[in-house]
Each structure stands twice: as structure tokens, then as C-alpha cells.
């Protein structure tokens, strides 16, 4: 079973355009350092330690190719390329995110990293069996058709290729209309129930390797991000505007509370496409 909120099919532009337009400024980098302990260019709940654990499930190495869906400004994608030696292609629906990612790749001198604008809610412009691995961190919940998305990723994976995604909006307790509205203010969200992702993975012919509840990371990251932003309230209100700043702070407070109370949870899924 799935539930949707907000009729827009992608996150609202103003929030994301402002974010990506200022992503590499010292102010926003400092907020990420304060929130996560170090700045890997993350835009969701991901920590460096968590990404390292995820990488251990993907078998990436030089000569392999990764597709990172909803890559944002590219920091975590480039970190994967640097740590594993694989080539990476990051895609995102926001041109400002891809511009930021391309700039960062040039600064870091990573020749095996590419970024392009693409809408992951639709069929992707790549041939069958192109990638050894596909990742999508804290963004699949913005795509309206879970079966279409996972079928498309299955098509793109090579035999024995691996898929890893996190779903940060799994409904694991009662939610009010007001709580959902605050938690999903930034555009379209698809809320799922326990077992839904596993079922769709199976229907798409993928073998689930790992399913893990990682809600605690979201609860901790939300609290730290809210506090880090509050420490720079004056600057952020000037850049973002009063209402967007307050909406983001309310979002982080709600995300943290619902995660802490285990009512809206975050899970990671790793799966494999059968070999020939």
C-alpha cells in the first residue's frame, strides 16, 4: 500500500533552487559540518559512516560503473568515485544541482565522473544493462510510481548488478493530516507501508539482499541539522526568506520527532539482479 501527498510530481523548485544555488558556499558547508561532523555534500540524512557501510554491499571497484539517481549537488557521488575508483554518472531533475555537481567534479579532478539532467520519474535515456550498480539515497519517495522506477532500474542493471536505495517515508505508526503536511511540505511524496518495497523488488525480478531499519540516523540528523541552521538563523533568513526558513525548520523538527517516535521510518534496501 502507498499513500501520496501534494499533487506536484517533483519537489518544489524554490526550496531546491535556493539550496543548490548556495550549496558550495562556506555558510552551507559549515552547516553540514556542524550537522554531520564532516561535509561530504549531503542533502538528506546520509552520513559518511553510513555511506561507507552502504558501499560494502555494492562491490564497486575500478572498471565498474555506478548510476546515482537524484544525485543532488554531487558530493556523495564523487566521494564514491574517489573511494572505489569506479566511474559514476549522477542524474538529477534540477539543472542547478547538476551545475553544482559538474563544478565540484572539475574542482576535484575526477575524470570518471559525469552528471546530467534527467527525470527519474520517467524512462531514463540509457541502454539496457549499462550499470554495475545503482543508488538512490533519500529520494525515491519523491518519485510517484514505485513499480515503474524499480522496473526501469532493473532494466539498466547488468546481470549480477546491485541496487541500493533508502526510503525515508515508510509509515510505521499513526500520523495526523497536519503532521503529514509539515513533513511533506517540499513537494510530492510517496509514503509506503512496511513490506511494499520488498514486494515490488520481487515483482521486478530482483533478489533482496538486505533490508535494515536506519530510522535512528534520520532522527539524529534531523535534530543536528535543525540546530546547525538555527545557529545561522539571521543569515539563512536573508538568503532563503522568512517563510521558507521557518518551513524548513518545522520540517526538520517534524522529521526528527516522527522518526524518534518510530511513526515515519527510514529503511535501506539492497538487491541484486540475477546473473546470466
What positions do the PLM features span?
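Conserved Class I S-adenosyl-L-methionine
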Residues: 210-276
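N-terminal, positively charged/glycine-rich alpha-helical extensions of SAM-dependent methyltransferases
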Residues: 1-35
Amino acid at each position: 500500500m502507498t499513500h501520496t501527498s501534494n499533487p506536484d510530481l517533483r519537489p518544489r523548485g524554490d526550496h531546491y533552487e535556493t539550496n543548490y544555488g548556495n550549496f558550495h558556499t562556506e555558510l552551507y558547508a559549515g552547516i553540514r559540518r556542524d550537522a554531520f561532523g564532516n561535509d561530504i555534500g549531503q542533502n538528506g540524512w546520509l552520513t559518511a559512516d553510513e555511506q561507507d557501510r552502504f558501499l560494502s554491499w555494492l562491490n564497486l571497484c575500478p572498471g565498474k560503473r555506478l548510476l546515482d539517481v537524484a544525485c543532488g549537488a554531487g558530493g556523495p557521488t564523487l566521494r564514491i568515485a574517489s573511494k572505489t575508483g569506479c566511474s559514476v554518472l549522477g542524474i538529477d531533475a534540477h539543472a542547478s544541482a547538476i551545475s553544482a555537481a559538474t563544478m565540484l567534479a572539475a574542482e576535484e579532478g575526477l575524470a570518471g565522473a559525469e552528471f546530467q539532467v534527467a527525470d527519474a520519474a520517467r524512462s531514463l535515456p540509457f541502454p539496457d544493462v549499462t550499470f554495475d550498480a545503482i543508488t538512490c539515497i533519500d529520494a525515491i519517495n519523491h518519485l510517484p510510481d514505485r513499480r515503474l522506477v524499480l522496473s526501469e532500474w532493473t532494466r539498466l542493471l547488468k546481470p549480477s548488478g546491485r541496487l541500493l536505495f533508502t526510503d525515508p517515508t515508510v509509515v510505521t505508526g499513526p500520523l495526523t493530516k497536519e503532521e503529514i503536511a509539515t513533513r511533506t511540505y517540499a513537494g510530492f511524496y510517496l509514503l509506503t507501508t512496511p513490506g511494499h518495497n520488498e514486494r515490488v523488488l520481487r515483482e521486478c525480478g530482483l533478489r533482496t539482499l538486505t533490508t535494515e531499519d536506519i530510522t535512528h540516523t534520520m532522527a539524529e540528523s534531523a535534530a543536528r541539522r535543525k540546530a546547525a541552521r538555527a545557529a545561522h538563523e539571521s543569515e539563512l533568513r536573508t538568503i532563503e526568506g522568512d517563510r521558507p526558513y521557518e518551513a524548513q525548520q518545522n520540517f526538520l523538527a517534524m522529521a526528527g520527532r516522527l522518526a524518534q517516535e518510530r511513526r515515519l521510518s527510514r529503511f535501506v534496501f539492497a538487491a541484486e539482479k540475477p546473473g546470466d
